[in-house]
């Protein structure tokens, strides 16, 4: 679940943009967003402190690299907007798969760009990805959904529909088995 999280230290901004990993009615772990965009419709750095700690989520015998939206867009540190690449940092934890929670707004051909970024990350790190994108609208922004499951080679294992809510159960152990094959 995406929501703001309080920054417990007095330095920096008061809040983090965060993903809450929930299980059995409890918060298991809070993951802070690292890359805070300040272009186009985004002005996140104005409100949020960037993440500086990188840890996977341990869940039912799997290590999950949980990332928030923009955190996957700095593939291989080649984006001059950022000096850190979250997946470079998380790679040392040897995650079984990447879970990216996004609220990426619709624009013409944006789904093609997202697919390229997802494929590039899977291929670069050899790790499968579950990319979950918001669907709906918020003021003047429209979110088109189109969530994706990709294997470690970047092949699309599943794509959920655009512009409608969808629910899909994904057996992540199957993704990991494909990765090991």
Identify the meaning behind each predicted range:
Residues 1-181:
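Enzyme catalytic cores with a strong preference for nitrogen-chemistry domains
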